[in-house]
UniProtKB/Swiss-Prot annotation:
This is Ovomucoid. It comes from Numida meleagris. One of its GO terms (molecular function) is serine-type endopeptidase inhibitor activity. Gene3D superfamilies: 3.30.60.30. CDD domains: KAZAL_FS (cd00104). The lineage of its organism: Eukaryota, Metazoa, Chordata, Craniata, Vertebrata. GO terms for cellular component: extracellular region.
Length: 54
């Protein structure tokens, strides 16, 4: 099972770095920062489906 450590998040701003992750909501997030901010917003209901685009 793929996992991402989001303990340092949320962050006020994310870089434009493109390292896509696919969330359990079937949405592609541009990078870990964008994904982790969404995880925090979802109160932990959002999880990582896999690395790479959905």
């Amino acid at each position: 099972l793929a996992a991402v450590d989001c303990s340092e998040y949320p962050k006020p701003a994310c870089t434009m770095e493109y390292r896509p992750l696919c969330g359990s909501d079937n949405k592609t997030y541009d990078n870990k920062c964008n994904f982790c901010n969404a995880v925090v917003e979802s109160n932990g209901t959002l999880t990582l489906s896999h690395f790479g685009k959905c």
